[in-house]
């Protein structure tokens, strides 16, 4: 009788824990833009997972869209770390063709445009209106998202995902909740004057950091009740730092989205600010990337106690361990939610 009572008690406790987890608040992870600095998101994600925090939504801009998009389809932080370290970034950030893989037909098309993918009978393409067309980075994104090349609903990914781009035809914000994942990520990281824009359905799409570099507002719209944000944006520069064309242009870009940025920082439950001092959006050498990933982890570890305490607000116990979808596996056709067209939101 004693053992039966003990068994019933254990079952009741397990049921209560399960019910509590089911009734918990939804958590959104927001990853800011920042070029090379965005690899710091990988280190921060490692800590968030170590803390056992459940992740219900991922939203990113620019490099945050790249890291977030891959994470949302099941790439683990460890896999992402390996991917970053395995790349020849000088090659990726150029349009130099790989002679071992470039077909003659591709070489003939090389001077026209980079990317052509079917979307509801039309195509998205990248023109030459930038220093870099982005041929090689787009090829990498395509390879990393095998199984997600159809037009799909990002809400049906292992973790629902969205990313932000800016339509420079009218200055509107474009939020990708559907479409071809590689195209959405590429559009979000089209830094004006560096990477060519993505032309899609009458829109000319550039880096979302121009309009919403830290998109907490989008995560809230998706249903996130708790926000954990990772921020690699540099603070505004002082007068004596604005001494070059690049610094002036960077300051102008940051000022455009400053009001939205401050509001979104204030709306974060935990705002993980990564120390990116000494590094820029172009710091793609291996030593810098390793340092930035380490700094991302260090920044998140500084907020460790806050992360653990946040579990109570989420509605889970401090010992709760979330399950994550990785490691990445190529999905079967039945896992994809094919839709007839790309839906975009322009608030």
What does each model-found stretch correspond to?
Residues 1-25:
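Bacterial Sec-dependent N-terminal signal peptides
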Residues 19-61, 69-347:
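Patatin-like phospholipase
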């Amino acid at each position: 009788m004693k053992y039966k009572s003990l068994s019933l008690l254990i079952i009741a406790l397990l049921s209560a824990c399960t019910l509590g987890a089911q009734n918990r608040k939804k958590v959104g992870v927001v990853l800011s833009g920042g070029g090379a600095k965005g690899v710091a998101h990988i280190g921060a994600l490692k800590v968030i997972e170590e803390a056992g925090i459940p992740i219900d939504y991922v939203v990113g801009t620019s490099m945050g869209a790249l890291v977030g998009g891959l994470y949302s389809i099941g790439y683990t932080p460890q896999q992402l770390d390996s991917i970053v370290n395995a790349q020849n970034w000088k090659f990726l950030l150029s349009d130099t063709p790989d002679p071992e893989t470039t077909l003659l037909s591709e070489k003939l098309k090389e001077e026209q445009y980079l990317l052509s993918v079917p979307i509801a009978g039309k195509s998205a393409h990248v023109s030459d209106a930038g220093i870099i067309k982005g041929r090689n980075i787009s090829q990498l994104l395509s390879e990393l998202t095998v199984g997600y090349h159809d037009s799909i609903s990002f809400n049906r990914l292992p973790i629902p995902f969205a990313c932000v781009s800016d339509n420079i035809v009218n200055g509107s914000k474009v939020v990708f909740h559907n479409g071809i994942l590689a195209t959405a990520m590429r559009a979000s990281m089209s830094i004006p004057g560096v990477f060519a824009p993505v032309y899609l359905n009458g829109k000319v799409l550039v880096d979302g950091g121009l309009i919403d570099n830290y998109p907490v507002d989008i995560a809230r719209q998706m249903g996130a009740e708790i926000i954990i944000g990772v921020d690699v944006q540099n603070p505004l520069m002082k007068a004596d730092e604005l001494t070059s064309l690049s610094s002036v242009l960077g300051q102008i870009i940051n000022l455009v989205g400053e009001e939205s940025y401050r509001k979104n920082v204030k709306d974060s439950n935990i705002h993980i600010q990564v120390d990116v001092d000494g590094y820029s959006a172009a710091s793609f050498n291996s030593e810098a990337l390793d340092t930035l990933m380490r700094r991302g982890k260090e920044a998140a570890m500084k907020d460790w106690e806050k992360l653990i305490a946040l579990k109570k607000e989420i509605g889970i116990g401090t010992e709760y361990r979330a399950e994550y979808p990785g490691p990445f596996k190529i999905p079967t056709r039945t896992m994809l939610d094919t839709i007839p067209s790309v839906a975009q939101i322009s608030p």
